[in-house]
């Protein structure tokens, strides 16, 4: 939905299953329209569309009429798409994803072709007068990079090819479309300084011709896990002329690692998603763990006595307090929205992203996924109003 003259808000449909186009479309019909009815008050309803590679290929198949059918459906149901989540290429629910969410990475032509296809689709379904974004992974996963020079060069080359492709689409359609690279714990670049350094390297090859085309998808969960301050991070990115393509509004688990909290945290261990942990020690040192079981094992071996805080990459509902043992990182979301309220042209795209519905502990689930999403909208709209981005 359009929340003011230039800013749009959606929820990301990666919360629903949808590997092929038919399953994806069914999710929009069965869930998204119900959320629309609960929150939109008759206004045009924005969709943050997740399209995996299989779904994108099916939707765009020549002669199938599927994309025309989808455009008609959007119009008939007072909906529109302004952003596509292009991070997960393959299966994202019901099976082990973990680090495989980074495959193929930007060293691969498969990732390039998939992302180009998403922009093809976006160029056709994006309404005139609205900018469009695609979000993607931060190049690769750190442990996949065995040759920094060679693989880094390949990532930068492929992103340049993608930038050229988007530039041509922008010129042929007259639509402002852009790619947002999404820093994430243990991604090839994961925090603000690493992101700035990446763009420095990228621009040393390509110059500044992609500045408006390739930017950052700033995920408030991810940067909070890195113990960053949203005000400082966003202003640093702006000072370095890095476009904020999209703001992901998402929240992480935060806890003081005592025995009771860590025991309760075991409820969040599951086999689908990667739950990176960053522990902060008394001396300010940050120590990273690949997944939640790694951090718990370290704690149980009495090797973390000086750790004063853990932040866990587990997206939790924005409106729901996780438990008495834990806190959340909603303060980072509030900081980001306060920055946006002072500089509304900083970013036009807001997207709530809590894809973990199926693996949440039962105590954190509401009646159903539609109910959860409706509550998240209410929380977010209240926060937007509190900082003046929505008039009362």
Q: What are these language model-derived features?
A:
Residues 166-296, 307, 316:
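Acidic/histidine-rich catalytic cores of soluble enzymes
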């Amino acid at each position: 939905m359009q929340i003011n003259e230039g800013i749009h808000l959606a929820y990301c449909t990666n919360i629903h299953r949808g590997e092929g186009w038919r399953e994806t479309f069914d999710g929009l019909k069965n869930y998204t329209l119900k959320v629309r009815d609960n929150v939109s008050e008759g206004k045009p309803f924005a969709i943050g569309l997740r399209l995996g590679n299989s779904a994108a290929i099916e939707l765009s198949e020549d002669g199938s009429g599927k994309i025309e059918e989808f455009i008609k459906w959007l119009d008939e149901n007072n909906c529109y798409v302004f952003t596509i989540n292009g991070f997960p290429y393959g299966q994202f629910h019901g099976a082990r994803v973990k680090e495989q969410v980074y495959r193929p990475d930007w060293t691969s032509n498969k990732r390039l072709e998939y992302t180009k296809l998403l922009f093809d689709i976006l160029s056709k379904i994006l309404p005139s007068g609205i900018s469009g974004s695609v979000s993607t992974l931060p190049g690769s996963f750190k442990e996949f990079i065995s040759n920094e020079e060679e693989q880094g060069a390949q990532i930068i080359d492929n992103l340049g090819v993608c930038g050229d492709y988007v530039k041509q689409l922008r010129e042929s359609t007259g639509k402002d479309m852009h790619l947002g690279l999404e820093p994430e714990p243990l991604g090839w670049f994961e925090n603000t300084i690493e992101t700035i350094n990446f763009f420095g390297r990228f621009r040393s090859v390509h110059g500044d011709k992609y500045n408006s085309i390739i930017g950052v998808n700033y995920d408030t969960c991810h940067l909070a896990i890195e113990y960053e301050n949203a005000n400082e991070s966003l202003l640093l990115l702006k000072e370095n002329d890095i476009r904020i393509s999209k703001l992901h509004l998402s929240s992480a688990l935060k806890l003081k690692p005592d025995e009771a909290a860590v025991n309760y945290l075991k409820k969040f261990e599951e086999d689908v998603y990667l739950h990176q942990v960053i522990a902060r020690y008394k001396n300010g040192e940050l120590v990273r763990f690949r997944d939640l079981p790694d951090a718990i094992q370290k704690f149980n071996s009495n090797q973390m006595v000086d750790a004063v805080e853990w932040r866990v990459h587990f997206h939790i509902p924005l409106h729901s307090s996780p438990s008495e043992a834990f806190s959340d990182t909603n303060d980072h979301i509030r900081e980001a929205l306060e920055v946006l309220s002072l500089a509304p042209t900083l970013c036009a795209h807001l997207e709530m992203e809590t894809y973990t519905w199926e693996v949440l502990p039962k105590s954190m689930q509401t009646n159903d996924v539609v109910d959860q999403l409706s509550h998240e909208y209410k929380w977010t709209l209240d926060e937007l109003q509190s900082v003046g981005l929505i008039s009362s």
